[in-house]
Curated annotation (Swiss-Prot):
Subunit composition and interactions: The RNAP catalytic core consists of 2 alpha, 1 beta, 1 beta' and 1 omega subunit. When a sigma factor is associated with the core the holoenzyme is formed, which can initiate transcription.
Domain of life assignment: Bacteria
GO molecular function, one term: zinc ion binding
Gene behind this protein: rpoC
Name assigned to this protein: DNA-directed RNA polymerase subunit beta'
Length: 1403
């Protein structure tokens, strides 16, 4: 009886809360302990009675009843027999739900290897036994025998014997003299007999003594897996299965279809195969069948079990009846349709609906229009409860009837229920957190959801048929979070850059722009010298002005004088007069009254940018509530006046410049000229192409400028008053719709088109859309247009995948503490590109905490260490002329798991310091991923002039005095100053002695300034020829040739058009005769002896292939003259990987194709002996360490000479640097700066602004691992990769014990790799390569402590971020209290000490 009572309690088990999940390999005993019985038959259900067969795959006796509280034969029914086991059919009377969690098992007649541990690379069984996978498979699939016990025979242990060899050995040495086995039994036996401790010790000794390069890596891998088995308590023989678990039947259901057929889960088929083969094998063994038959059956059993676990990993894919591969257990987990991504990370939710959206201009910002029908359905439970409470209905059934009939009282109650109950609206794709926002519903007729126009930008919604989903937050907590955190009024700023996102667009912008136009000569305008009517156009009162407008005494655009009353800085009323227009006065009426928001904010032409700045000003000074009210007001104003203005355009508004054809003809003549030059052989095909494309691009731009000039000019009417501005220009200039590029296509010329490959077609489209295209032009333009459409589709998928990888790598970066107390930081300065300031210092440091005091020149501290730089500090920082600020960054944050608030700085979406528990990683990932679809996909070929123009000179962006560092300059024959060194740098020093800028000069650059010169902004410092790389002489003397033999290493060509002879170095390595020549030019003295260079070597300059020689032998040269030059055509059309592929390349930390070679030490360069087709360079470091050797392919131009001195980090060969090299050579800070700048570069091209800190968060996640260079006194081996935090933990322990700490260097991992290497195996498994991750985790017996967000979503608990971050704290407090109470109780009762108590269950 007692047992039955216990059973009663066992049934309704409460869900257990847990803190961590461990995964390990299950032992046969464990599988049996889960099982409720063995499955002996392959039958599923009886097709006549539809009852499950006994001992079959759906057996009710093993898995539980089909109907709640009813046994199979019907003897026991109802609750009262709960827990009784029917003696007739053996079924326990309980809930049918147990069929979802009761497991069965199959006893295998022969052991079988688990395919994951065998075939998932690297093969765990193979590593453990140190056997090749091929050999293992030969044993397992019964092709070879394996010697287990050689006995006294000459056979070796684990030697493989084929069938013949085995029989021969048996004959030779006798049957019992040795033991050889075959199949999984053999492997199991070997695994059982392994002595892991002994192997581990042997391996450690071997690693210590080995000298080769690759051996330790292999041994390390093996040692790791052996240690994994030792630590995790897994036994190696468990990788061979003797029992196969059978998952609960309701997870592999059999569903009756109409027509008497059944749809079944593939797993049932796979299980049936295993059971059939297993039963057949059992029978064959009983019948003592011949060995060969039994072996074949065992092999088939092995294959059946393989297919069940992972179909298709080995051998043929097992297919079902319709030739479709069967879904195995592994397939159930992996991929987008697998368990992780389909059901655990994203679920469908109830209490939701979706409908089309329409615009709701009369809504307030916090409202949305919800159709009554939808509201009635969504809020049903609330309505039922209310009807019950008010006594309209006694039962739910009655309430249901009332609602279905839509009685009037139901509508009243719906109104009550909805009041202040926010709903969430979501538009797919949800690319960032503003894709879901909360609104208060307002009931409307009709069936479409109404959306406030200002939130469209955040949702990226438009009203051309978009749909949105509505979700109802049910619990009080959910409603609270929706209201406080997700309400649209609380999301005014964009999390990516901190600018307002509730910005008017399109009609609203057009209306406000129209409102703020000024027109000359409009009626009733104010004229200062108006003697007849001096008071005309002077107003001081809003009513008076409105009256004048209504009477048409004055127009919206007339110039008037206006007396404005506002609030002064001291809070007192303040009046001021402004010259303005009535339109602007009306606009100013919407402004909140505040000292920092004067009339000047609206007294300008309101383009979209100005409106955004205005909203920003209002938000920063007046706070959130005022901004929301203000936004609603200007929205109404904008719509109203756009409607009143009635702006529209006709075809005559597209003005074609009348001088169009003359410009086009000029260009045509130019192009003809280039064609002729090409035909005469003066220029190459490539040069001609570049020049032609260039000419047409210039022509197109010139036409566009002409057209813009005509459209934007204001016409006068006969009275001299301004006519209305051109409508198209208004739309484009205000930022409402259309761009100059589109206007150019409408009214100037369509311009150059691209082929699908991205190359530009030489023939442009000269017509515009107003004139119409002819057939050929139309055909040309279809080319690029189709490519555009195809690109868009690809781009979306690519961008989504990038976002997914970013979220995955950054999901556990959460704010965990207020200040980690680190003293380090990173230096920030303005980004200057080709003399243009691209990002000012102020924008980069705003909202970040300082890492050291910011001190002005007079010694006053502007910002103290650890304080955040706010807007109010910026004027002082600019005034102090500070160029570089050291700020805190997440890259240097010392918080163990997560980041600290001080290092992160301001929360951009709120404008306040970041909150505890904010999931900054996910925000960073969304901010970088969301604009992904706006980036381009293709790699550009930038033709001709485009790239050259920006890289041939340096301009100063500061005023100051010039200093020249590493001065290696010489005056050449023309009297110009030439930089003859590789690291000459021009430093601009400000008046206060602070270095303002440092410019490294190109070798051979012509200096326009000298030491001590004063320089102004915009003045040129130096310039160089971008088309050539010069080889300069550094001494004065006479030119001599060495090994320059005409016809062997040099050719002389005469230019036909000019008759000038040109000497070019040709490839002399082609033939054996000439291959040992070393063509060079030597500078000699009068006696023909080579002159010495300052650094001691001869003045001998080796010439690369294709060098054009500049002097004849015997010519006199001065230092700085160009002896020879190499033409750099290659630089002109280098593919620039742009857009998304570039961003992905940087985040994945891939090595670029033509990676630059970077000097890893400062030192001297020497050329060694050439090696095959590579040049050998040796770098002898100045610090006396070992020389470094570089092998460089012959084709690459090395712009260094023998004996040149390079600094650490200089490029030896140009190209894109590999991020790993930057990290290794220049360190973390340089790497971060490089990645941030390169990624920002791509986004800047598209006009997308993202704050640096987001990229820093991702880079921090990429730098989490450290490679151990010296294990110190720990058991960690060098070459291992461990977490940064683990390293510090280990070292703290080691130093405390007075031992030698571990040394390591940071490693950069790409985002995919970093995601797969997170501590949490659940997170990694749900990301990619599920099988591999789970196999590895199981072998290591990994424990997932559920610290990140993803793991918690998967196990279904609250995420430890945001409002959920408190839960962890509360739990730990509760645990401490529990422990204290226990101790008190023990102290009182003198019970056993805490250590021996069973561990407390996690809350």
């Amino acid at each position: 009886m007692n047992q039955e009572v216990m059973n009663l309690f066992n049934q309704q088990a409460q869900p257990v809360s847990f803190d961590q999940i461990k995964i390990s390999i299950s032992s046969p005993e464990k599988i049996l302990s889960w099982s409720y019985g063995e499955i002996k038959k392959p039958e599923t259900i009886n097709y006549r009675t539809f009852k499950p067969e006994r001992d079959g795959l759906f057996c009710a006796r093993i898995f539980g009843p089909i109907k709640d509280y009813e046994c199979l034969c019907g003897k026991y029914k109802r609750m009262k027999y709960k827990g009784v086991i029917c003696e007739k059919c053996g079924v326990e009377v309980t809930l049918a739900r147990v069929r979802r969690d009761r497991m069965g098992h199959i006893e295998l007649a022969a052991p079988v290897a688990h395919i994951w541990f065998l075939k998932s690379l690297p093969s765990r069984i193979g590593l453990l036994l140190d056997m090749a996978l091929k050999d293992l498979e030969r044993i397992l699939y019964f092709e070879s025998y394996c010697v287990i016990e050689p006995g006294l025979t000459p056979l070796k242990e684990r030697q493989l014997l084929s069938e013949e060899e085995y029989l021969r050995a048996q004959e030779e040495y006798g049957e019992d003299s040795f033991t050889a086995m075959i199949g999984a039994e053999a492997i199991r036996r070997i695994l059982q007999e392994l002595d892991l401790d002994k192997i581990a010790n042997d391996l450690r000794e071997e690693i210590a003594v080995t000298t080769s390069e690759l051996k330790p890596k292999k041994l390390l891998k093996r040692l790791k897996i052996i240690e994994a088995f030792q630590m995790s308590g897994n036994k190696p023989e468990w990788m061979i299965l003797t029992v196969v678990p059978v998952i609960p039947p309701d997870l592999r259901p059999l569903v009756p279809l109409d027509g008497g057929r059944f749809a079944t889960s593939d797993l049932n088929d796979l299980y049936r195969r295993v059971i059939n083969r297993n039963n057949r094998l059992k029978r064959l063994i009983e019948l003592r069948a011949p060995d060969i038959i039994i072996r074949n059956e065992k092999r088939m059993l092995q294959e059946a079990v393989d297919a069940l676990f992972d179909n298709g990993r080995r051998g043929r894919v097992i297919t079902g009846a319709n030739k479709r591969p069967l879904k195995s257990l592994a397939d159930m987990l992996k991929g987008k349709q697998g368990r992780f991504r389909q059901n655990l990370l994203g679920k469908r939710v109830d209490y939701s609906g979706r409908s089309v959206i329409v615009v709701g201009p009369e809504l307030k910002l916090h409202q949305c229009g919800l159709p009554k029908k939808m509201a009635l359905e969504l809020f049903k439970p609330f309505i039922y409860a209310r009807l019950d409470a008010k006594g309209f209905s006694a039962t739910v059934k009655q309430a249901k009837k009332l609602v279905e009939k839509e009685k009037p009282e139901v509508w009243d109650i719906l109104d009550e229920v909805i009041r202040e109950h926010p709903v969430m609206l979501n538009r797919a794709p949800t690319l960032h957190r503003l894709g879901i926002q909360a609104f208060e519903p307002k009931l409307i007729e009709g069936k479409a959801i109404q959306l406030h126009p200002l939130v469209c930008a955040a949702f990226n919604a438009d009203f051309d048929g978009d749909q949105m989903a509505v979700h109802v937050p049910l619990s009080l907590e959910a409603q609270l979070e929706a209201r406080v955190l997700m309400m649209s009024t609380n999301n005014i700023l964009h999390p990516a850059n901190g600018q307002p996102i509730i910005v008017p667009s399109q009609d609203i912008v057009l209306g406000l722009y129209y409102l703020s136009i000024v027109a000359e000569g409009a009626p009733g305008e104010y004229k200062p010298d108006n003697a007849k009517n001096p008071m005309q156009g002077v107003y001081g009162d809003m009513g008076e002005l409105e009256h004048a407008l209504a009477a048409k005494a004055v127009s919206l655009h007339s110039k008037i004088k206006w007396r404005w009353t506002g609030i002064g800085p001291d809070g007192e009323p303040l009046t001021k007069t402004y010259e303005t227009t009535p339109g602007r006065v009306i606009l100013s009426g919407a402004l909140p009254k505040h000292a920092k928001v004067p009339f000047d904010v609206v007294n300008k032409l309101m383009t979209k940018k100005e409106i955004s700045a205005m909203i920003d000003t209002v938000y920063r000074h007046c706070g959130q509530k005022e901004s929301v009210i203000f936004c609603d007001r200007i929205m109404a104003l904008g719509f109203n006046h756009a409607f009143k203005a009635g702006i529209s355009f006709g075809k005559d508004d597209m003005v074609v410049p009348e001088n169009k054809w003359s410009i086009v003809d000029t260009t045509r003549a130019l192009v003809k000229d280039y064609e002729q030059q090409y035909n005469d052989g003066l220029i190459t095909q490539g040069e001609k192409y570049n020049k032609v494309v260039d000419a047409w691009a210039k022509c197109s731009d010139k036409l566009a400028a002409e057209m813009m000039g005509r459209i934007s000019s204001v016409q006068k009417d006969e009275k001299g008053a301004d006519k209305q501005v051109n409508s198209i220009y208004m739309m484009s200039h205000s930022g409402a719709r259309g761009s100059p590029a589109q206007m150019k296509q409408l009214a100037a010329m369509r311009g150059l088109m691209a082929k699908p490959s991205g190359e530009i077609i030489e023939t442009p489209i000269i017509s515009n859309f107003k004139e119409g295209l002819d057939v050929l032009e139309y055909f040309n333009s279809t080319h690029g247009a189709r490519k555009g459409l195809a690109d868009t589709a690809l781009k979306t998928a690519n961008s989504g995948y990038l976002t997914r990888r970013l979220v995955d790598v950054a999901q556990d970066a959460v704010i965990r503490e207020v200040d980690c107390g680190t003293t380090s930081g990173i230096k920030m300065r303005a980004i200057v590109d080709a003399g243009q300031v691209v990002a000012t210092l102020a924008t980069r440091i705003l909202g970040r905490a300082t890492a050291e005091d910011l001190v002005a020149a007079d010694g006053t501290v502007i910002v103290k260490t650890g304080e955040t730089i706010e807007e109010r500090h910026l004027p002082a920082i600019n005034a102090a002329g500070i160029q570089e600020v050291k700020i805190r960054s997440v890259l240097v944050c010392a918080t163990k798991s997560g980041v600290c608030a001080t290092c992160y700085g301001r929360d951009l979406a709120r404008g306040t310091p970041v909150n505890m528990g904010e999931a900054v990683g996910v925000i960073a990932a969304q901010s970088i991923g969301e604009p992904g679809t706006q980036l381009t996909m293709r790699t550009f070929h930038i033709g001709g002039a485009a790239q050259i123009a920006d890289s041939s000179f340096i301009e100063s962006s500061f005023e100051g005095t010039i200093k020249i560092r590493n001065r290696a300059v010489a005056k050449n024959t023309d009297g110009d100053l030439i930089a003859t060194g590789r690291n000459v740098a021009v430093v601009i020093v400000g008046s206060d002695g602070v270095e303002r800028a440092v410019h490294r000069l190109q070798y051979g650059a012509k200096l326009r300034v000298d030491e001590g010169d004063k320089i102004k902004r915009g003045q040129r410092i130096a310039e160089w020829d971008p088309y050539t790389r010069p080889i300069l002489t550094e001494v004065d003397g006479i030119v001599a040739y060495e090994d320059l033999v005409d016809g062997q290493s040099m050719t002389e060509t005469t230019d036909e058009s000019t008759g000038i002879a040109k000497r070019v170095v040709v490839d002399w390595r082609g033939s054996a005769r000439t291959s040992d020549l070393k063509p060079a030019m030597v500078v000699v003295d009068r006696d023909g002896k080579a002159l010495k260079l300052p650094r001691g070597s001869d003045a001998r300059y080796f010439l690369p292939v294709d060098a054009i020689i500049g002097f004849d032998p015997g010519a006199t040269v001065k230092a700085g003259d160009i002896l020879a030059r190499v033409s750099t055509d290659s630089a002109k059309t280098r593919d620039i990987t742009g857009g998304l592929p570039r961003v992905a390349e940087l985040f994945e930390a891939r090595r670029p194709k033509d990676a630059a070679i970077i000097a890893e030490k400062s030192g001297t360069i020497a050329f060694g002996r050439d090696y095959k087709n590579k040049r050998r360079l040796t770098l002898t470091p100045h610090d006396g360490s070992e020389a470094v050797e570089y092998l460089i392919p012959k084709g690459k131009h090395i712009h260094l000479q023998d004996g040149d001195v390079v600094e650490l980090g200089d490029y030896i060969v140009d190209g894109n640097p590999a991020p790993h090299d930057i990290l290794a050579i220049k360190g973390v800070e340089e790497l971060a700066a490089y990645l941030v700048n390169e990624i920002q570069e791509v986004y800047r091209l598209q006009g997308v602004s993202i704050n640096d800190k987001h990229i820093e968060v991702i880079v921090r996640q990429m730098l989490q691992k450290v490679e151990v260079t010296d294990g110190g006194d720990s058991d960690i081996l060098s070459g291992d990769q461990i977490d940064r935090t683990e390293l510090t933990d280990y070292n703290e322990k080691l130093l405390a014990e007075g031992k030698k700490p571990i040394q390591g260097v940071p490693v950069l991992l790409g985002i995919t790799k970093a995601s797969l290497q997170t501590k949490s195996f659940i997170s990694a498994a749900s990301f990619q390569e599920t099988t591999r991750v789970l196999t590895e985790a199981a072998v290591n017996g990994k424990v997932d402590t559920l610290e990140g967000l993803k793991e918690n979503v998967i196990v279904g608990s609250l995420i430890p971020a945001g409002t959920g971050s408190m839960v962890a704290d509360i739990r730990s407090i509760a645990r401490r209290r529990d422990a204290m109470i226990l101790q008190q109780k023990q102290a009182e009762s003198g019970a056993m000490p805490v250590e021996e108590l069973p561990p407390a269950a996690a809350e």
